[in-house]
Structure formats: structure tokens, C-alpha cells
């Protein structure tokens, strides 16, 4: 690698490329003279589109090929949507930077209805996320929830073709792609608690690459990093993956972190909720203790059922 060149491994979806260009522009603004190249790749998650993520290995399908490129020194950094980043990293790799967060809420998107509550009974709602399905089913058990895979454009096309009455997407993705006008309503966390890290962009690199880590330091957003740290600590303690509905959302209000979380049965029949408030420096411990509260309040049984008896201790 030339000293003035930095290579970004990225997926080729429009949203992934937006994120990669966002990081590229930030790096070049912070380090004049730096040459930043994109290394576009196809991941298994981009190829397997006919099966729900939970059944084919979860969100890690979107990052594995990028991590291999880092380990083989074909790229220097990988740019991820934080909600797709697994809790564990391959040896030698790690998350070193979290950029400023976009709006983390879920978006209600429909051509005929202004809100979730306006949908008639029997309406078909599309989402690929068990977390969203679970919360939808709890609030509106009279709706028909169907799986929806593909990139943002594909999902919107399926809505426009009449396959769904409404779909649920991330506000952040729609805003970044210039599609904010498609949002009929942003769902508050009380209705749809976001995914861990939703709306944030994370950067992974080789942990022994001190030059790259120095270049990335300017892009780290302290408040976002604190919030995502609390959310991910909760998820790590739960050993959360794609197979179980887990939501976690931290806000920084008046110098204090407010962390909310839930674990649910996939059909929405049971949702265990909890929250914590505390000092920012305690973000990680807050996440762990909230996870333990959820486990003790019934989440352990939900996880055991989903994972065939193999629940966190």
C-alpha cells in the first residue's frame, strides 16, 4: 500500500456506496493529499435474497467478505451500517470508528395510508426484520406481515407494484438516498424500538494498522460512539443475533445516557422491555446490566426457545 493511498472495502448496493463515499469525503477533507479508493465487493447477503436473513446466517452475511479483504490486505478499512455488524470480530480486526448518527428511527412507507394505525385489518406489511415484525405483531395483530428482502429500491418497487400495503424501512437509509419524501411517518421508539446501532456508520480495520487508525480518528463521533457502545454491550451480553427480535436504543439527554431495550418472541406474543439511565462513562456496564435484567425477566426463556435451549447464562 502506498503511504498516501487508503482502500475502502464496500458492498455495491446504493446505500453501501453512499456510506463508502461519505467516509471517503470525510477522510479527504481531514487529510488533504490522501488518495482514497473504493474496493466494491459482493457479499453472500447481497446474493441470497429469497430467504429471510435469520434462516441463512444473519446480518454477518453482509460483512464477512469485506473482513476477508481486510485480512488479505486487499483493503485497509471496511465501512458498515452498524446495525449489520456482528458482536464478534475475526482475530486481528476491530471496530475503530463510529461516525455521527443519522435519524435511527424506523419509517412507515405506504402509498395509500398515512400511519401504521390507519392500516385496515388484513393489510399486508413488508419487513425483513424480526425486530420490526415482533413489535408490529404486538401493536397490530390484525395485520399480515410478510418477509421483504432486497435493497431499498427493490423494496420500494415491490410496494409500488402492489405486493404490500405498507413496508417498514430505516429512516436513515431513505434520507441518505434522497428518498425522504417516501416516508409517511417516522415511528417513535415507543412504537418501534430501533435496532442496535441503527443509523450509524462504523469503520473496521486491522487493529495493528496504526497509520490507518490515526487517519480514522478524526471521523469518530464521541456521542454516537457512547450511545452505540451501550446498545452493543446489551446485545453482546444477550448473545443477540438475527434469529431473535432484539431492539436497543440509547439517547444522550442532559449529560445522561437513557438506554431502552427489548427482547421479543418472533410472533409478538411476548416482549420483555427495560431501561436504564446513567453516566456516559458507564455506557458499557449499563448495557450489560440492562441485558441481565431482561434475561432475568423472561428474555432467557425466549432466547432458549429460539436457540433450541442454548440461552445465555
Swiss-Prot record:
Pfam family, any one: Porphobil_deam
Protein origin, superkingdom: Bacteria
Leading EC class: transferase
Pathway: Porphyrin-containing compound metabolism; protoporphyrin-IX biosynthesis; coproporphyrinogen-III from 5-aminolevulinate: step 2/4
Residues bearing PTM S-(dipyrrolylmethanemethyl)cysteine: 242
GO molecular function, one term: hydroxymethylbilane synthase activity
Entry keywords, A to Z: Porphyrin biosynthesis, Transferase
Matching CDD domains: PBP2_EcHMBS_like
Transferase recorded as keyword: yes
Impact after mutating residue 59 to Q: 25-fold decrease in activity
Cofactor note text: Binds 1 dipyrromethane group covalently.
Cofactor annotation: dipyrromethane
Segments passing through the bilayer: none
EC number: 2.5.1.61
BP GO terms, sorted: heme biosynthetic process; protoporphyrinogen IX biosynthetic process; tetrapyrrole biosynthetic process
Effect of residue 7 to L: No loss of activity
GO cellular component labels: cytoplasm; cytosol
Catalytic activity from the UniProt record: 4 porphobilinogen + H2O = hydroxymethylbilane + 4 NH4(+)
Family: Belongs to the HMBS family.
Record's subunit section: Monomer.
Extra remark: Arginine residues that are closely associated with one another might be involved in substrate binding. The porphobilinogen subunits are added to the dipyrromethane group.
Functional description taken from the UniProt entry: Tetrapolymerization of the monopyrrole PBG into the hydroxymethylbilane pre-uroporphyrinogen in several discrete steps.
Identification of the protein by name: Porphobilinogen deaminase
Source organism of the structure: Escherichia coli (strain K12)
Species lineage: Bacteria, Pseudomonadati, Pseudomonadota, Gammaproteobacteria, Enterobacterales
